[in-house]
Amino acid sequence: MTRVYNFSAGPAVLPEEVLQQAKDELRDWHGSGMSVMEMSHRGKEFIAIAEKAEADLRELLGIPADYKVLFLQGGASAQFAMVPMNLLRGKKSADYVNTGEWSKKAIKEAKKFAGVNVAATAEATNFSTVPPQQEWKLDPGAAYVHYTPNETIGGVEFSFVPETGGVPLVVDMSSTILSRPTDVSKFGVIYAGAQKNIGPAGLTIVIVREELMGQALPGTPSMFDYKVHADAASMYNTPPTYAWYVAGLVFEWLKNKGGLKSMAEINQRKSAKLYAFIDSSGGFYKNPVEKHSRSWMNVPFTLKDAALDEPFLKGAKGAGLIQLKGHRSVGGMRASIYNAMPESGIDALIAYMRDFMSKNG
């Protein structure tokens, strides 16, 4: 069977090397006679897997010692609630920046727990750009500032880390984590669903500064309290062990690729190549995002005539290029090109797009 190029926004493509290692170890992990899926999460075998995964993630991101790394469940959607439940700490409001669909979801959930000050929004530009920070209206008394550095649906990405004047900065890094170097010390909380750049669905990584834990809202369920999970080394309940294991393999793969600086160079090159082709197509293909706000990870584009969408997708599938249909809320196409998408996948996509244009232009 020939592998396809999978441009899914998530669950997304995994590195070939990781899939092969997982296959090789599936029935017998390191001579244990067990699959990782069968291991007790409190047994020494899985503890070794868990500890190495955390150590490798800390090394890749340069996570300071005063931050806890939590391996949780529930995706970013659960974090939309966990963030205000844990970080309000006696305050009544928080600042949010609205740059698209995932920002909106976070804002909607936060309103159940606190007053939300939308400090900036990209609605006026139909979410085609990131509002410059000089236009933001931050509240110095806010409990925290929340933003989404990359909107996977709209393909809008921040090119800067916001300055918050000492107010804790919270970031939904689900689609950009590990795609480039990150100064973790600038953030109070980083959270990320795993199914884009980390591993399989079912795992959520949360990186939280220790001083921000331990003041959850009264009545917060134990499963939603960061400190409960930190004190239990992410094993307050049975964690998603296999997803944690595969994430660890991805961390090893990233280290072997040269780390996040090397990954950033590859990702920038991949996205630049695809945008350059779209921009040179004479309007046959269009990307709606302002150039300075274009995403490295998610490239949405439309064809000159929506009637060509279905033939385009059918032909792409025949060429081994799948999951290119845009999100239902915006239509068109979307190529998600996370870390594990090889550059050859971009080349194959461009070749197909060029051929389709020549036949339908």
What are these regions, as identified by a protein language model?
Residues 285-316:
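Conserved PLP-binding catalytic core of the aspartate aminotransferase-like
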